[in-house]
Amino acid sequence: MKIELVQLAGRDGDTAYNLSRTLNAIATCAGDTDLLVFPETYLSGFVGGAQLAQVAEPLHGTTLQTLLQAVRQRDVAVVLGFAEVHQGRFYNSSVLVTPEGIALQYRKTHLWPSERSDFSPGDRFTTVLWRGVRVGLLICYDIELPETSRALAQLGAEVVIVTNGNMDPYGPVHRTAIMARAQENQLFAVMVNRVGAGDDGLVFAGGSMAVDPFGRVLFEAGRDEVRHVVELDLDQLKAARRDYDYLKDRRLMLSGEQTEHPDGRRELLIGASQ
């Protein structure tokens, strides 16, 4: 599987600009690319307050429909984030968009402190089978909580994709976390961060990474814009679990209702008390 990490700067609240950059990346990707990954809330940027209501869109809104058309034209898939509105609530969401449609939606379950006054947390973890590989999504702060990636591993994830919006001075935290999450679950982890300046004096830390099931770094970006393709050797999944398998050896299961849907999605619901 060939995955392009698309580490870009963006504009907060400027969906048209961010969408234009996204479409250009799709149009110019290599012909054998399977998947492009963009940063957290890349389409909308980071917004809050009254501005959030102006830029947030429903799951099947016009921006994602435009994105879907581009995905179909190139026969690739895309993972990226946006500010979602649903039934009057706002969510920090990421989606896996394939030529067949929106294959997977994930709402950030662990909100950063400054987000909690604007966004509602998601209530489930989800994986889906895509091109023979089971994929799960996480968003930024999620990866600092080991239970999030373990939930996806419990749902059979082989590749965890993280849309990231990590800023200074926390870059080293996510560098450590993404390697740990890959190694302790014996799966691939791909994290794509934003770069450049944001609103309110934020400076995004870059450092997008791809890590193999042994916790070894396959690629690590710097602090500038970059597009880089990594090819995942899926045989490494079996190799990492040959001598010991953490999921089989563990004695503690994560709680929550687990469901498998006819379309292949697997979900683990977070209990009301959690």
Curated annotation (Swiss-Prot):
UniProt key word Cytoplasm: no
GO molecular function: hydrolase activity
Key words, A-Z: Hydrolase
Top-level taxon of origin: Bacteria
UniProt note: pH dependence: Optimum pH is 8.0. Stable from pH 6.0 to 9.0.
Gene3D superfamilies referenced in this protein's UniProt entry, alphabetically: Carbon-nitrogen hydrolase (3.60.110.10)
Residues at the active site: 40 (proton acceptor), 108 (proton donor), 140 (nucleophile)
Bridged cysteine pairs (disulfide): none
Regulation: Completely inhibited by p-chloromercuribenzoate, N-ethylmaleimide, MnSO(4), MnCl(2), CoCl(2), NiCl(2), CuSO(4), CuCl(2), ZnSO(4), ZnCl(2), AgNO(3), CdCl(2), HgCl(2) and PbCl(2). Partially inhibited by FeCl(3) and Fe(NH(4))(2)(SO(4))(2). Slightly enhanced by dithiothreitol. Unaffected by LiBr, H(2)BO(3), NaCl, MgSO(4), MgCl(2), AlCl(3), KCl, CaCl(2), CrCl(3), RbCl, Na(2)MoO(4), (NH(4))(6)Mo(7)O(24), CsCl and BaCl(2). Unaffected by the chelating agents o-phenanthroline, 8-hydroxyquinoline, enthylenediaminetetraacetic acid and alpha,alpha'-dipyridyl.
Pfam families listed in its UniProt record: CN_hydrolase
Temperature dependence comment: Optimum temperature is 45 degrees Celsius, activity decreases rapidly above 45 degrees Celsius possibly due to instability at higher temperatures. Inactivated following 10 minutes incubation at 55 degrees Celsius, and only retains 2.6% of activity after 10 minutes incubation at 50 degrees Celsius.
Quaternary state and interactors: Monomer.
Functional description taken from the UniProt entry: Hydrolyzes (R)-piperazine-2-carboxamide and (R)-piperazine-2-tert-butylcarboxamide with strict R-stereoselectivity. Also active towards beta-alaninamide, piperidine-3-carboxmide, D-glutaminamide and slightly active towards L-glutaminamide and piperidine-4-carboxamide.
Protein name stated in the entry: (R)-stereoselective amidase
Lineage: Bacteria, Pseudomonadati, Pseudomonadota, Gammaproteobacteria, Pseudomonadales
